[in-house]
Amino acid sequence: TSPLEHRRELNQATDLCFGLLPYGLFGGYAIMTFFAPLAFPEAYLDGTHGASAVDVFTVLLAGWGLTLLATPTYTSLMAGQHPWRFTLFILLVLLAAIALGFVLVLEGPAEPGRKLYAAAVASSLSAGVLLMLSWWMSGELEVVRHRRDEWTLVFIGGSFIIAGLVSQTLWWTLGLPLFLFTKQGWKAVRSTLD
């Protein structure tokens, strides 16, 4: 593939990820909220054991979102001209996950419920490291910079969604503009079908 075609495909993949993000965050939360009472005893939902299952899942949704957003550059790194970088990438993400787990879980709170919540936070932060490393190691940082306004909206909107859902406040409404990426997402899907 030519560099121009590669950039076009990377932008289309990013458009698709931007378009999927709000649906995944809100859809995942809605599914968990609906099915959690069917799958878990009340003690896992009311905070008896520390963090509720819904709270833990909501924090993990942040990690899902960050992993989704890393997909285009992660894939570019994996399929790039220097496959050894992908091995180094995996090693660095693993080391970051171990460090975050050590600090937040092993050295963190003593109560088991809080440890579980801390583990979810560590997992989501590891996904953030994965995203940042995929940008840097794939050599696609310029493509990301070129779309910095969109990335800023995605990060701010996604943060408001997660913060609002975790705190059960209306902060999530400030993430609704992410649905504006739906049209770009559909356009990206249609272009892959042509």
Whereabouts are the PLM-identified features?
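Specific pore-lining/lateral-gate transmembrane helices of multi-pass inner-membrane transport
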Residues: 1-90
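Short, surface-exposed helix-loop/turn micro-motifs enriched in polar/charged residues
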Residues: 6, 117, 143-146
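Membrane-embedded alpha-helical segments of multi-pass transporters/permeases
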Residues: 25-33, 38, 59, 98-103, ...
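Membrane-interface helix-loop junctions in multi-pass transport and translocation proteins
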Residues: 54, 84-86, 90-132, 163-177
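Alpha-helical transmembrane segments
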Residues: 73-82, 133-149
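Membrane-proximal transmembrane or re-entrant/amphipathic helices at the cytosolic face
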Residues: 143-154, 158-194
